[in-house]
């Protein structure tokens, strides 16, 4: 299981968590929502953590046009005072820096993208990529872009959240994702699945609201298996192999 960082302030905690639990794979990156929280030495700090922990990946990084179109909702989601969201130019600059670090080290990268799939595809086509591939987490892009991303080495993960009836359109996109590029995720603590996908209810002590967590992963896999018309066991074997290929020890083809 991968634990993604969102910014400099949580990278030590990510590393410590992975140190306590050997089954966890740490990831370090600056999420586009938190770019304004970087220090002057953020690039050196990122390189430090990636080089200190060779099993680590880069993430979560990406592009987000949604927050530029919905700044008040973005601020509300952050739960604290914030200025204007980072511009697309600022996001693209930070993304390319981190993406190149992943490519130079051949580390997988977990990508966040909201309403910016065209610019993201253009950047990926124009820059060197990790040979082992990368993950488009909670893929919310159009079906017609799946082949283009897949040709560049993309894997596509589906969260339990996509089992909500209102996400039917996006769920359908995963019917055309190549079988050897599909992964399952929770995106915990965000993207709470439907009640049927919650195995162990948790409450966020800060808000009193239900909290998503990794133990909901099996239910997400079972729901996706039913949707795709395969057994849960078959999908578990398939996605486990995909996970090992992307995040496990690398073997050149």
Positions of the model-derived regions?
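Mid-domain alpha/beta scaffold segments of enzyme catalytic cores
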Residues: 1-253
């Amino acid at each position: 299981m991968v634990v993604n960082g969102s910014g400099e302030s949580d990278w030590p905690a990510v590393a410590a968590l992975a140190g306590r639990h050997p089954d966890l794979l740490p990831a370090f990156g600056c999420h586009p929502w938190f770019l304004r929280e970087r220090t002057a030495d953020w690039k050196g700090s990122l390189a430090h953590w990636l080089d200190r922990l060779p099993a680590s990946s880069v993430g979560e990084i990406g592009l987000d046009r949604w927050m530029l179109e919905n700044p008040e909702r973005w601020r509300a989601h952050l739960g604290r005072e914030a200025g204007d969201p980072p511009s697309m130019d600022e996001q693209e600059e930070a993304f390319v820096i981190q993406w190149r670090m992943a490519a130079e080290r051949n580390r997988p990268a977990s990508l966040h993208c909201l309403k910016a799939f065209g610019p993201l595809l253009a950047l990926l086509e124009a820059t060197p990529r990790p040979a082992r591939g990368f993950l488009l987490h909670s893929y919310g892009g159009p079906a017609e872009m799946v082949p283009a991303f897949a040709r560049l080495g993309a894997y596509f993960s589906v969260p339990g959240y996509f089992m909500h009836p209102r996400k039917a359109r996006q769920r359908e996109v995963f019917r055309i994702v190549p079988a050897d590029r599909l992964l399952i995720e929770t995106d915990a603590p965000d993207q709470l699945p439907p009640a049927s996908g919650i195995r162990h209810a948790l409450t966020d002590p800060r808000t009193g609201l239900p909290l998503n967590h990794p133990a909901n992963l099996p239910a997400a896999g079972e729901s996706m298996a039913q949707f795709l018309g395969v057994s849960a066991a078959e999908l578990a074997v398939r996605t486990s192999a995909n996970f090992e290929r992307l995040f496990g020890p690398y073997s050149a083809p």
